[in-house]
Amino acid sequence: MVRKNILLVEDNEVNRRLAGFLLRSQGYQVREATTALEAFEMLKNDHPDLIVMDIQLPGMDGLEVSRKLKEQPATADIPVIAVTSYAMKGDREKALAAGCAGYVTKPIDKTTFIQEVAAHVGNKSKTED
């Protein structure tokens, strides 16, 4: 099986470490960025199978990043999962309207998170084995 490559964009170190650990525990190859600018720089040389991105990033928020990714032919096909601590009514719809393929709330529920990721990279998660 080919290891799927995921770009994790999260500015909070604790959340980044947790999400990175969960992804790596499922066999995914993970690259990490802490800002939108850093993510865009990485995407110049890398084409991940999935982007898992915090909505509240410094500088440019995750929804704006998702919109910009969908506008660029080189990145338009990369699914984005939005991760947010805000779960207000309509937030999921805003994320999907911005081009996100999925939406996960914090605190991250391991099973939900892994299933959402697996649904967008085409891998069966280890929790389903």
Residue ranges and their predicted role:
Residues 32-50:
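Acidic, metal-coordinating helix/loop segments flanking the phosphotransfer/catalytic sites
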Residues 17-25:
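Charged docking surfaces used in two-component/phosphorelay signaling
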Residues 108-117:
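C-terminal output helix
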Residues 16, 58, 76, 88, ...:
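The feature encodes the CheY-like receiver
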Residues 10:
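Conserved acidic carboxylate
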Residues 54, 84:
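Active-site residues of response regulator receiver
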Residues 101:
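Short, glycine/charged-rich "phosphate-handling" switch motifs in NTP-dependent
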